[in-house]
């Protein structure tokens, strides 16, 4: 055993150990505890592994004025007590199991996936080494997918029992809905017949697939085409938002925010998705639009219908159908072509009338209305697609254009009738003049 002693060491200033001891004899002995023996025995080595290191006092040590104070305890009151009394609990050796328990628990918590029982187990003081996750399903994809497993699994823990009535929840599946991959309606569980709200009452309230009332106002947006002096706001309903997120447009969060006139912000898309989830609509992040963006994409349905109505009024009252018909009739004033041209105009009028009658039978949904169908489903579905792309502007606009074209055809037929009468009258006058000349010659 190798033991180091310091009894014979001398100071560099020439004073011996005896002189130094005489100088420091007045200091209290409790200020400096006995130094541990420096040895290399196995027992001492095992105990030294858990001994705290030496920490100097947190204050600067002033030089001791040797020989100037008769009483060192009175001159230095801060040395009266034990300066290392606060480190006494650290000097107690800890067993290896307690020292490594916290790192092992932290590593286990880092390796295990976040489950249902991790926070409750820690809150109840349960042993972290026990694995409760094998008997309990983890809810990773929402309540609708794991509600039955949560109600059936024997948790056996207080405070973690299934919610009352949770086992009665069942997912509603509409047989007529074919919105599997592109669905924007959030599937939520609805109570069964035994619950207070039945499926019949939900159907009456138009809560189809978890969506709230389609006629409920989602927000109000200012018009894009109105003047500043007559700015009007249009109400956007929940049903319109659902139509904009559904085919054929399938708008993403960025385009929908532009349609709703929402200012761009850092978390604008996330806030919009959270608000849509509250009304039962699902807008996944990173979604791509399905249709090309046009100027009509920025219009809400109310403004698009307003634009179509104004366009129809202008076409009916301001389109120069008579001037255009007279101009074209003068270019085809040959008497030999009058009959053939009139036949072509009558045929065009008939074709235009047939097409106008077809457009008049269009029953595309306008807003939240669902009129009864008149046309065949194949033709009506195509017209509905066109109406959804134009937000209700396309059909009325085409009808207004057809009305203007029909007015042109009517004015053209009137012009041809006048030209035919004038040509017949002029021909009859020429025959009378020739007869008079023949009589004078006789």
Swiss-Prot record:
Subcellular location: Nucleus
Keywords carried by this UniProt record: Activator, DNA-binding, Nucleus, Phosphoprotein, Transcription, Transcription regulation
GO molecular function terms listed in the Swiss-Prot or TrEMBL record: DNA-binding transcription activator activity, RNA polymerase II-specific; DNA-binding transcription factor activity, RNA polymerase II-specific; identical protein binding; RNA polymerase II cis-regulatory region sequence-specific DNA binding; RNA polymerase II transcription regulatory region sequence-specific DNA binding; sequence-specific double-stranded DNA binding
Entry comment describing in which tissues the protein is expressed: Expressed in skin, primary keratinocytes, immortalized keratinocytes, and HeLa cell line.
GO biological process, one term: regulation of cell population proliferation
Superkingdom of source: Eukaryota
Chain positions with Phosphoserine modification: 246
GO cellular component: chromatin; nucleus
Disulfide partners: none
Pfam families: TF_AP-2 (PF03299)
Short motif PPxY motif, span: 54-59
Subunit structure: Binds DNA as a dimer. Can form homodimers or heterodimers with other AP-2 family members.
Role according to the record: Sequence-specific DNA-binding protein that interacts with inducible viral and cellular enhancer elements to regulate transcription of selected genes. AP-2 factors bind to the consensus sequence 5'-GCCNNNGGC-3' and activate genes involved in a large spectrum of important biological functions including proper eye, face, body wall, limb and neural tube development. They also suppress a number of genes including MCAM/MUC18, C/EBP alpha and MYC. AP-2-epsilon may play a role in the development of the CNS and in cartilage differentiation.
PANTHER family in the cross-refs: TRANSCRIPTION FACTOR AP-2, TRANSCRIPTION FACTOR AP-2-EPSILON
The family this protein is said to belong to: Belongs to the AP-2 family.
Protein name listed in UniProt: Transcription factor AP-2-epsilon
């Amino acid at each position: 055993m190798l033991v180091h002693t310091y009894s014979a060491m001398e100071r560099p200033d020439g004073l011996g150990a005896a002189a130094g001891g005489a100088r420091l004899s007045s200091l209290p002995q409790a200020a400096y505890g006995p130094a541990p023996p420096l040895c290399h025995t196995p027992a001492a080595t095992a105990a030294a592994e858990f001994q705290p290191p030496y920490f100097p006092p947190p204050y600067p040590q002033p030089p001791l004025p040797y020989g100037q104070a008769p009483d060192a305890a009175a001159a230095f009151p801060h040395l009266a007590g034990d300066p290392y009394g606060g480190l006494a609990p650290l000097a107690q050796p800890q067993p290896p199991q307690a020292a490594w328990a916290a790192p092992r628990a932290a590593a286990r918590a880092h390796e295990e996936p976040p489950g249902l029982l991790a926070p409750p187990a820690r809150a109840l003081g349960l042993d972290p080494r026990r694995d409760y996750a094998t008997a309990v399903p983890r809810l990773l994809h929402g309540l609708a997918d794991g509600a039955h497993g949560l109600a059936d699994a024997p948790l056996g823990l207080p405070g973690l029992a299934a919610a009352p009535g949770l086992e009665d929840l069942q997912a509603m599946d509409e047989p007529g809905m074919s919105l599997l991959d592109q669905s924007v309606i959030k599937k939520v569980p609805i109570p069964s017949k035994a619950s207070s709200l039945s499926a019949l009452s939900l159907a009456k309230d138009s809560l189809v697939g978890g969506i709230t009332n389609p006629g409920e106002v989602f927000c109000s947006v200012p018009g894009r085409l109105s003047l500043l002096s007559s700015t009007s706001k249009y109400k956007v309903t929940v049903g319109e938002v659902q139509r904009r997120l559904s085919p054929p447009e399938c708008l993403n969060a960025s385009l929908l925010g532009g349609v709703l006139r929402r200012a761009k912000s850092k978390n604008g898309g996330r806030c919009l998705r959270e608000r849509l989830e509250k009304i039962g609509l699902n807008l996944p992040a990173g979604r791509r639009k399905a249709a090309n963006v046009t100027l009509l994409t920025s219009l809400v349905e109310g403004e698009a219908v307003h634009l179509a109505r104004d366009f129809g009024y202008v076409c009916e009252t301001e389109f120069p159908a008579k001037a255009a018909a007279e101009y074209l009739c003068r270019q085809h004033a040959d008497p030999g072509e009058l009959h053939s041209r009139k036949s072509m105009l009558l045929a065009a009028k008939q074709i235009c009338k047939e097409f106008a009658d077809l457009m008049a039978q269009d029953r595309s949904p306008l807003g939240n209305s669902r009129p009864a169908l008149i046309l065949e489903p194949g033709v009506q579905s195509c017209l509905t697609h066109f109406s959804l792309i134009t937000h209700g502007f396309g059909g009325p606009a085409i009808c207004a254009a057809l009305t203007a074209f029909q007015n042109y055809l009517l004015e053209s037929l009137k012009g041809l009738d006048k030209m035919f009468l004038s040509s017949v009258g002029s021909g009859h006058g020429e025959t009378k003049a020739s007869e008079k000349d023949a009589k004078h010659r006789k």
